[in-house]
Amino acid sequence: MNNQGMKNPDMKATILLPGTASGDVLKLEAPLSFWGGVDPKTGTIIQVRHPQCGTRISGRILCLPATIGSSSSSAVLLELIRGGNAPAALVMGAPDAILLIGCLVAKEMGWEAPPAVALSAENQRQLADGHYTLAADGAMIPTAS
């Protein structure tokens, strides 16, 4: 696959937590609260009114155009990381300090946490569906799965 996965192949995200990841992109159609919205045991969206309820976020490059805050979201993300059900990477429309805390605590505990980047909701929509690699410099590179 080539750079046609994005309308703008030079698009780069702002690095919030460094790292690399690869996986299928999951572009959320609506904001999500991790607290009460994601099952920490399965990595499945359980927020009943969410359009993607029932979809697993585990191992995916999760594009969050916006989040619905709860201070407990960091604990849910930490449980997802501990249980091996976390997203491969977090792509946030705007930095969410609460989710980032979950990743930072996981790293402090010696667990591998997903990298996190900021990419506007508009730019997230430009990502084609498919498999991507999030490069260390924040580039979203379409790749074969």
What does each of the following model-derived ranges do?
Residues T14-L17, L26-A136:
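Feature captures the catalytic cores and cofactor-binding loops of soluble hydro-lyases/lyases
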